[in-house]
Structures are given as C-alpha cells and as structure tokens.
Regions:
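Transmembrane beta-barrel strands of outer-membrane/channel proteins
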Residues: 136-142, 180-186, 267-271, 312-318, ...
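Extracytoplasmic gating/loop element in the C-terminal half of outer-membrane beta-barrel translocons
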Residues: 699-700, 718-720, 729-827, 833, ...
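Acidic, glycine-rich flexible loop segments
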Residues: 29-294, 304-306, 318-322, 331-339, ...
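Hydrophobic, lipid-facing positions within transmembrane beta-strands of outer-membrane proteins
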Residues: 74, 119, 132, 160-166, ...
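Gram-negative outer-membrane beta-barrel transporters
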Residues: 459, 584-726, 733-741
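Solvent-exposed loop/turn elements at secondary-structure boundaries
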Residues: 333-334, 464-481, 485-631, 687, ...
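C-terminal beta-signal and terminal closure region of outer-membrane beta-barrel proteins
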Residues: 761, 765, 808-809, 846-880
Length: 880
C-alpha cells in the first residue's frame, strides 16, 4: 500500500481546470479574503476521493509550487517507473514533517509523517450539480521570460509550454448529474545540462586491435562534437542543450444518479497519457517513455437509516509503462565510472509493463449516541505482466584500474566488468491483497473526543501464470494495525491538546519480487570481470542456462510488508484572537524496511592473486556469482518538532508559516526503497558481516531544518465601487510561497574496486578512509566549495573504509514562488481570472551533490543544479 501513499500524480485529480494553478488563493467572490494555506500548486492535481487507488503514475514536468517547490532540472534523469518520481522528489526536497490530527480507520498512513499522502477507500463521494457550470483554462510559459540556469553557457534556447482544458457539468434530469473534464499539455523546448565528455585529445581509441578500435570509436562517437566549455569546473564538462517533447492528455467523465432519498450510484472513468520524446545531451542517454493510465469506478450508496450509510464500490485500474532505448548502432549500455556521462540508455531498458488492479470495497458509517462507527474492507487482485531487462543488451563498466584512469581504459578497450542477461524474462504475476477495518469516534464529554481503530490486512505471495517462477515467501496474513487518538479542549480557553498513535503497513512492491525472473533455469545474469571487449561472454555456454554460473536473486521465506509505528502530540491555541498556533511533535519507528544484501563476495584466498580478474574464483559459493538476498533488513527512525502559525485574515493579509526540526535515520534503506535496481545499489554495505553498524546513518531524505511560508494579500480597493480605479486596481491578489530547507545528505564512494584503491571483493561501493576528520559532516553547497581529495585514503584488499554513510550534505533550498491574480465577476457564478506566476522568483540555484567517487577527476566538485532557473507563466481561467 506504500505505492498508494507515494503517488506523485494521479489521473483522477480534481477538475482539469485546477491542474496547473499557481501559488495564489482563488477568491470565490469579489470581497473574499485570500487564504494563505489554500495556495494551489503548479503541477500535479491533488488526489481526490477516487485517487485511493493502487496504480501509481509517474509524470515529468510537474511541480508542487504551492508547497514552495521549484521546477526540477530535467537533466537529473530517472526512469518513469515504480515510485521513482516520488523518490526523486524526496531526495531533492527532503521530508516534510506532518502531524496527522486523526487516524481514520479506513485510511493507511504509512510514511504520512514524512509528507506522503495517506491512501483510503476507493469509493466515490456523492455529489449534485445544478445548471450548466464549469470552466475553461489556458496557461502559457515561454523561454523568452525564463532565466538561465546557473551553469548555462549562452542564452536560453527557445521553449514553450501550453496547458489548456475545460470542465463542464450539469444536472440532466431528476437525480442525474453528468460532468466531463479534459486537458492537454504540450511542452516543446530544450533541456540545458552539463555532461562530461572526452577532451579533444581523448576522441580516438588507444587500442591497437582494429576490431576493438571500431567498437571503441562507436562509443566515443556518442558524445557531441562540441568540446568542453566549462573547463573552469571540470576539464571534461560541456554545458549544452537538447530538444525534448512532452505530450500530456487527460480525460475524466462522471455520471451520478440518485433514486429518492436513499439510493445513489456514481460512475467515473479517467484516462491519462504522457508521451516523452526524451532529450539526448549525448546520444543514447535517455529512453523514450510512454505512460498510460485507465481508471474506472462504480459506487453504490444507500442511506440505511437516518444514522447509517452504506457504500459498495468496484474499481479497475490499469497503468502501462513503455520505456524504449534510442535507436543506435551501439546497443550496449556503457558506464565510465563518473568520469564521463554514461550512455546506452542504462542496463534496465527496455521495459514494457502493464499493471491491472481490480478492487472491491464496502464501507459502513453509523452513529449510535455519541459514537460514530466506521467499518468495512477492501480486496485487491493484482496482475503485473511484461518484459523488463536486466543487462539483456549487455553493459560495460570502465573504472579506474590497471594503472589507468577510467577514460584511458575506455579508449584502450579495457573494461573492468561486463554484465549480460540471457534468457526469457517475460512474466505475468498475480497476487491478492486485502484489508478490513473498524473504528469508533466517541465523544464522552463535550470537551473530549476519542478515536480508536483496528485494521487487519493480508498480502499473498505472487504466482506466475506460466509457472516459470516460484516465489518462496509465505502469505503475510497477520498485519494487525491498531490506532488510537484523542482531542481534549483545555479549560479556560487554553486551546486543544491532540495526540495519536497508529501502526501502519506498507507493501511488498511488484518490482521487489519480480527480480526472481532473472534466475536460472530460464535466465542467467552474468558478471564477467576484465572481459574481452569484442567477445565478453565467449567462454560461457549459454545453451543450458540452468548450468550457467550467474547472479542469484533470492527472497527470504520470512519476507513481510514493512510497517511503521507513528505517534504524535500537539497543542493548538490562539495567542491572539483569530490567530492559531500549533506546537507539536511527531515520530515514528519503522521496522522491517525492504533491503537487498549482496552476499557471496570475493574473499582474500591464500594462493589466489587478489585482482579483479580472480574475483569469481574467490567467491565462497562456486556455483553462483553475486547472491542478492531480498529481506526485511532495515529500520527507520524519525523524530520531528513542528510549529505552525495561521493568520487567516488580517487587513487583507493571510499567512501560514511552518517550521520543523527533524532527524531521519535508517539502517541502510528507507521507507521508499524497493530493494531492486538502483535502490539495491544505494544500500550496499562494505562487507557481508556487521551490515547494520556499517550502514546506520542519516537517511538520504533527511533535511533537519525547514521553513515554509505562505502569504496571500488582497490589494485594497482604491476608489468607489464601479469607478475606473476600482475596476483597474480592485480584486488583485498577490501571493508568495517560500521554502527554505537544509540540503539532503550524500554519500562518498571509492569509485573503483581495483587493488590499491578498493577492497577487490567484486562489488563497488566501498567508502574511503577518512584522513582529515575536520571535513566530516561538511555541507558542499556551492561550486566554490570543493571537497578535498586529500582528506580521504584508499583501502587495502579485503578492507573497509571508516567514513560513515551519507556523511556530507548538499546545499540548501532557498526558493520563492510568487503570483499576481485579478478576478473579474461577470454576473452570477461567471468570472474571468487572469494570473501571472513566477517559479523561483529570485533565480536561486539549488545545487546537486558534487562528484562522489574518489577515483574520478570530478570528485568533490559540483557540476549540476537540481532546479531550473526563474520562469514566468501567464494564464486565463473563465468560469461559468
């Protein structure tokens, strides 16, 4: 269910007309005061009641600017699959400490204390419509008014973004309502970014073998002919531009019918599509992506009595993702440490996945005296099918080794490792998940409210439709989750005291268990050290995959859904009339977080040289290569103190200010870790023993200090009603959202497993020795600040670095978004709103982490930003 709570964007949001609203408060009448906490966001629609679905959708080009977020730098690439979009946002922005005022029994609040939205029942809420009403909107962003990003060379390249749509609805006949929402967004422009390319003197092969020279030249030719133009930062850095196109289409139709006062039915269908023609700063850098989502809901509601209500819902969700590599004569993926930008679209491409979820739920609400009872349940049937590569196109890794740097080894055709997947990995998995819940909200006295709830859930292991794989973990059928909370009105007007405790379960991700598809006898994952460049797998007979020595993916039989124990306490009071101040604490402990441990690493064996070439000879189990074990191998710790101040209306000004101080730690993996692909590499330990002491550190999402300020100001009328001055200067609203946060941590790695550098165990990722403790914990927040290479030392074979994980921080977030809006009333509900918005108004860069691999030339140097430069956007919204 964690997938639900991590929804970055959902197809069934509010009406299309609210999709890209800027940070301003929308007035409902000419004299309405703005609400600071109503500042909408630029991008993703917030989930509606129908969004409590199981299929997450990743989309590019969206930002929650109403929460102070800037537009992300598209050059920070991630694949639009799984929960990657949510993880990218959490790494870039950190956590947002959130106190839940009441744990509703029908909702799951796993990770909600960190800012993730809770998921809930699938039912559609009842609604009624009158005569024709709706709105039409259009918004435009143009590069002519955009500022350059920090590292950009030359002017801003042409780009434009158009977002438009409509919403319309009305009552058809007695008890019947119908509405349609539709929108499109078209982005045509250029992505600016930094890439590391060979110097002019590094554009030719060094190998003497003619055939190898051809292949090496193909690898070098993927880089643009432009020469490095930011040599002030790195001698190989090139700032350049590449075209990217994004097409978004969304459609929602809904029909409601009521029969009398007791019966009603609601039906809704939504479709969402995004097509991304990805930018290529270097050829074959990024895959093209097609994302499609279908969602259908039918809810029957019946009023059983004046004090009880029943809802029955059936739903179907389908999310399809297709990621395809750019066509090229070079089919393999290539990684050149971080000395050059990687190319070949990555080793996990292509991906062709379809996910169907059938949901059925029931919900009953009943009032008995002072008790408000809620009970019900849901059951899910999941179907996940498709093809997902794991180095099936092959992948070369060139690192600093053999006495050369990584670029020289590339030019010489001397790879450190070759990865290859061989076999059939098309699969279809099926499993069940369900939950029941009961809760009671009781008011024993006028000043005291109590709520208590209990959820029980189950999660079955998946089965493969053709019986190609067997998942060896048991049914997770003992997930009992109690909740308790209270709200007490203190005497003498001293405010209200709230507290709560809840146990909430996550889920086992599809991508977590689907890794077993890469095992023999139907597939083999090969890891070949020091391969022959032209025939890296020539010595391996792949005719019988069952006998091939490959990587083994295992899942512990005790694998279970992670869970979190969340607790909070807050005091709300009015320091002055109509002002609300809240002081609170929230914390959680999250056992059984998913992790992947890399075992069967090479040891120091007497009589065998400790080199990269002998890695596979020195593994304890001679029948396999790397052993990758998925288990509940981590634990999360979170504590935060938070203060909120709300000033609703004060001389035309509305303010909501928040500050929180928090600490987030884990034992190697966090609540969003899927224990697969890049997540598994991020969490690898230095050794196979003492893993938890080695990995315990700050989480990659940790951001201890944060301030969020929302301000909306309604400009006063300057003349009599109806005068030209009132018409020109009245009904203007100025809004501002400011987000200031400490940067999130980053990790330092050795960058090479070679003798004299790393520990030669066949797995990269070990950390260096810390020679200068004065740099420990430093913030590297500006290109003028460099992490000194001489502060770190290399390892002995079989050793481990003494530098802790995530020991340094990126620079802070200092972002301000602003907007100016004018509303004209056209009579009745008709109105026209003009809005101008700026994101990153002061053009403040948020810098990415510096180079993190000690053996690379760009170590310790910042070469990228995480946000775009300042942008302006205008929009019109006509409501009727």
């Amino acid at each position: 269910m964690l997938a639900c709570s991590l929804l970055l964007f959902a197809a069934l949001g509010p009406s299309a007309g609210t999709k890209d609203t800027p940070p301003t408060a929308t007035a409902t009448a000419a004299e309405t005061q703005p609400e600071a906490d109503a500042a909408p966001s630029e991008a993703s629609p917030e989930p509606s009641e129908a969004d409590a679905s199981d299929g997450e959708v990743n989309l590019l080009g969206r930002a929650k600017t109403g929460s102070g977020e800037g537009r992300r730098n598209e050059n920070v690439q991630f694949n639009l699959i799984d929960n990657n979009a949510a993880k990218e946002a959490a790494i870039r922005l950190g956590t947002s400490a959130t106190l839940v005022s009441e744990f509703a029994p029908e909702r799951n609040y796993f990770s909600s204390e960190l800012g993730a939205a809770p998921n809930g029942p699938v039912a559609l809420r009842a609604r009624t419509l009158g005569d024709w009403h709706g709105n039409v909107f259009w918004r435009h962003l143009n590069s002519a008014t955009s500022a350059r990003s920090f590292f950009q060379v030359g002017g801003v390249k042409p780009a434009r973004e158009n977002d438009y749509g409509f919403r319309v609805g009305r009552a058809l006949w007695r008890g019947a309502n119908f509405s349609v929402d539709a929108s499109q967004r078209r982005i045509r422009g250029n992505v600016n970014g930094n890439v590391l390319v060979p110097r002019p003197d590094e554009r030719t092969p060094l190998t003497d073998d003619p055939a190898e020279r051809v292949l090496v030249q193909q690898m070098l030719d993927v880089f643009p002919t432009e020469t490095p133009n930011r040599t002030d930062i790195n001698e190989r850095m090139l700032n350049t531009n590449a075209a990217q196109g994004i097409d978004d289409d969304s459609f929602t139709a809904r029909f409601d019918q009521a029969w009398g006062d007791k019966n009603r039915v609601a039906m809704q269908y939504s479709y969402l599509q995004q097509l991304v023609d990805a930018f290529q700063l270097i050829r074959t850098q990024n895959p093209d992506t097609t994302t499609r989502s279908h969602r259908a809901r039918i809810t029957y509601g019946r009023t059983l009595s004046p004090t009880s209500e029943l809802q029955l819902t059936t739903a179907f969700d389908r999310a399809a993702s297709l990621l395809t590599p750019e066509e090229s004569e070079l089919e393999t993926a290539v990684f050149v440490s971080t000395a050059l930008t990687s190319f070949g679209n990555g080793s996990t491409i292509p991906i062709d996945r379809a996910r169907n979820v059938f949901r059925h739920g029931a919900l009953v609400r009943k009032t008995v005296g002072r008790h408000e009872l809620t009970y019900g349940g849901e059951v899910f049937r999941r179907q996940v099918s498709g093809f997902e590569a794991d180095a099936h196109r092959g992948a070369y890794s060139f690192n600093r080794a053999f006495g050369n740097d990584a670029v020289t080894n590339l030019r010489s055709g001397t790879a450190s490792t070759y990865f290859l997947g061989v076999g059939n990995v098309h699969r279809g998995y099926r499993n069940w998940e369900g939950e029941t819940f009961v809760g009671d909200r009781w008011s024993p006295t006028p000043g005291l409210d109590l709520n208590i709830g209990l959820r029980w859930g189950f999660l079955t292991p998946p089965t493969e439709v053709d019986e190609l794989d067997g998942v060896a973990y048991d049914c997770d059928c003992n997930n009992f989750a109690p909740t308790f909370g209270f709200a007490y009105r203190l005497p003498h007007g001293a405010g209200r005291l709230r507290g709560g405790f809840g146990l909430h379960y996550g889920t086992i991700f599809d991508v977590t268990y689907m890794q077993i598809r890469y095992n023999s006898p139907n597939n083999a994952k090969l890891v070949i050290p020091t391969p022959d460049l032209l025939a890296p797998a020539s010595d391996i007979d792949v005719s019988d995959l069952g006998s091939v020595r490959g990587v083994r993916y295992e899942i512990t039989p005790e694998l279970a859904a992670p869970y979190s124990m969340q607790y909070n306490l807050s005091w709300e009071f009015e320091p002055v009339s109509n002002w609300l101040l809240s002081l609170g604490y929230v914390g959680s402990r999250s056992p059984k977080l998913l992790a992947q441990w890399h075992l069967n690493r090479a040891r120091i064996v007497e009589g065998i040289p400790t080199t990269l070439r002998t890695v596979n000879e020195r593994r304890p189990d001679p029948t396999i290569l790397d052993r990758r074990l998925v288990l509940n191998g981590s634990r999360g710790y979170f504590d935060a103190a938070k203060m909120d101040l709300t000033i609703p209306h004060w001389k035309g000004l509305s303010v909501r200010a928040s500050y929180w101080f928090s600490k987030l730690m884990d034992l190697g993996t966090d609540y969003a870790n899927t224990a697969s692909n890049e997540d598994s590499w991020r969490a690898r330990s230095q050794r196979v023993t003492d893993i938890h002491p080695d990995m315990k550190a700050l989480s990659r999402f940790d951001s201890p200090h944060a301030t969020l300020l929302r301000v909306a100001y309604a400009l006063p009328r300057t003349g009599p009603r109806g005068s030209w001055r009132a018409a020109a200067f009245g009904n203007w609203t100025l809004s501002m959202v400011s987000l200031m946060k400490t940067g999130t941590p980053f990790n330092i790695e050795m960058g090479s497993d070679a003798p004299g550098l790393g520990n030669v165990d066949g797995l990269p990722g070990e950390r260096p020795m810390l020679l200068d403790p004065s740099v420990h914990g430093a913030t590297i927040g500006h290109p003028d600040t460099v992490l000194p290479r001489e502060a770190f030392g290399f390892l002995e074979p079989g050793g481990a670095g003494d530098l802790g994980r995530n020991a340094f921080r990126k620079g802070p977030i200092r972002n301000v978004n602003a907007s100016l809006a004018r509303r004209w009333s056209l009579g009745g509900e008709a109105a026209l709103t003009l809005r101008a918005e700026s994101v990153n108004f002061f053009n403040t860069p948020q810098f990415a982490a510096p180079g993190t691999r000690l053996t690379d030339q760009n170590f310790g140097v910042i070469t990228n930003t995480l946000n775009e430069g300042r942008t302006f956007r205008v929009g019109l919204d006509a409501a009727f």
